[in-house]
Amino acid sequence: VLDVSRFSISWSRLFPLGNEEQPNEQGVAYYDSIFRELKKKGIKIFLTMNHYAVPLYLVESIGGWKNREMIDHYLSFAEFVLSRWGNQVDFWLPFNEINAGFFSPYNGTGLIKPSNGDYIYQDVFQALHYQFVANAKTIQLARKMDIPGIFGSMVSCFCYYPLTPKPEDNLKLVKEEQINQWFCSDVLMQGEYPYYMHSFFEKNSVDLDITAEDRQILKEYTCDFVSFSYYSSS
């Protein structure tokens, strides 16, 4: 018996450019049919609002999530989803595998890899910060709209092993896991950056645009649960 169905809304299916005032009606009808069928079968809905579907226009025109403007574009999309289907959803994920912004920036945050090198930490973590703020503001919006359901954070988990039993190898493993896996949920659940990220930012010359309003919204609108995907044991 299927009790819960998790599925994702494609931002670009509803708003192909990402900044339209009105949604694509064919996309709306498509999702209406899914919600209707699940409710008819008595199946609870676990909805992911953004699953690697940053509209290409926003990637190419403003640089994806490294631009603060993305927060407002995302919230316009989120407001439509909440108003259209909010009363039918039991569990919410504003962002799928949010730590993908670190290990796969193009998929996670719509960052295009520079042609002359690799991604730079300044852009990667700035983009993640703006997603954290958008996540918190989505929860704030849902509370103002009296939307039922609970909101969670989600990361992609990997299984790492130290090279040897030596303390230095185990410590290196812990530090890598902190950045790769845990810090995103730490921010979304606790409402602030953990101590180890401050050290990491200083060491890597990362200076984020974080406003007082950002800090307040992160602290006030944290997630209700932690979730993760886990595809393999090694």
Q: Where are each of the predicted segments found?
A:
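Catalytic domains of carbohydrate-active enzymes, especially glycoside hydrolases
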Residues: 1-10, 220-226
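Charged helix-capping and loop-helix junction motifs
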Residues: 24-30
